[in-house]
Amino acid sequence: MEQNISSQILLSLIQEGLHVRALAVRLGTNHSTVLRRLQELVEENAVDFRTEGKNKVYYVKKTIEGRNRVIMAEYCRLSQILKRYPYLRGPVKTLLSHSEVPLVLIFGSHAKGTATGRSDIDVFLEKGEKTLKQELEKKYPRLSVKIGDFDPASPLVREMMKGHVIVKGVERYYDATGFFSETAA
């Protein structure tokens, strides 16, 4: 549970800097728990804050520790999705076995946690082949596979970046988005 809260905090702070109350509301937990986890993450050099008025606005620090904690948080998010939607285990295992695909994302309702029994499973494959797409969609009829380059300037990719689960290629994802590069905003 402790790791889960820290992971959720990091994944929220990747999107934008937030203060403690906003994080607590977003995560549906109490203020003191969020504050304790934030203090631990600050001590680990993974998170930092800036003061705006009377509030401390926390953000992910672009350090090796911050990068490592975010990578662990992404794997934790994948585990949470597999726990919530056990029928994703088969497709995820199949997707992981394709070494020629450097980046695999689940996006849409499954990534956001709003999937129903009839929801399709939206998957993005970077540099996949059409034959792979057809093979996957034949084996798992609920899969809706998108293939292409991971270009953060693309409207589809920008939409995926708002709500996704990284199945494969966490480092590739953050290298492509430039989040941990020195020139990233």
Predicted regions and their residues:
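Short acidic amphipathic segments
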Residues: 101-107
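Catalytic core of pol beta-like nucleotidyltransferases
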Residues: 1-100, 111-116, 126-185
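Acidic Asp/Glu-based divalent-cation binding sites
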Residues: 120-122
